[in-house]
From Swiss-Prot:
It comes from the Eukaryota. The keyword Transmembrane applies. Residues 199-210 have a biased composition (Acidic residues). The chain crosses the membrane at residues 7-23. Residues 27-230 are annotated as: Disordered. Residues 50-59 have a biased composition (Low complexity). It is a single-pass membrane protein. Residues 60-83, 113-173, 211-230 have a biased composition (Basic and acidic residues). GO terms for cellular component: membrane. This is Uncharacterized protein AH6.3. Residues 101-112 have a biased composition (Basic residues). It comes from Caenorhabditis elegans. It is found in: Membrane.
Amino acid sequence: MDYIQMLFTASILSLGYLVFICGKKKKPKPTASTESVSPLNEPKPPPQSAVPQKPAAPAAEEKAPVDPKDPKSKDVDEAKKPDPANSKKSNKSKKPEKGSKKSKKSEKSKKKKTEEKVMSEDKPERPDKLTEEEKPDAKEKKEIEKEKTKEKEKTKEKEKTQEKEKSKDETVPKQHAPSLKRQEGDKNPEITNPIVTPETDEFPTIDEDAEKTKKTEKKDVKTEGTLKKN
């Protein structure tokens, strides 16, 4: 603002100085009195052909030259020149503007980095991406899925067979082994110790066992009778 004011004042002073010089060069015209001058004594103007006509000067050349010795002209030139102090101040004022822009950009970048860090901390950790070598192919995936389905079907079939066997065991009654005990209506005694004969390698028949038992019973009766007599 100071530099602009100085230029404005210098331009005003230069214009005033030029107007002052132009006014000095213009001479005032003589004013003749009406009483002394009569129409008879009026001088006649010379003809136009006799008087040489001067060419009209352009408007740019009409400006009066400035004398270098005049102190006013020096003041005007000094006013037009820019002050070094003002120029330095203007340069200094421009420099911090660039620095302030850089500082603003750096602050924005720092804010973005801090926001990204906070967002990354809030998000749950994701597993690292597998490399191309570690990634299984589509065919391998299909084979693995088929094997899994087959295993599931096998387990289901096993469970079904086990359930069927359990249901059969529950419905069919257990077949007990034939007991060797004598029933109430049978006259034949129990077969306690079957002996295999070396000749036939077969079990003795029921009739043979009955004869043996009768003999033993007769012996027992005889012994009981002898004991009673005694």
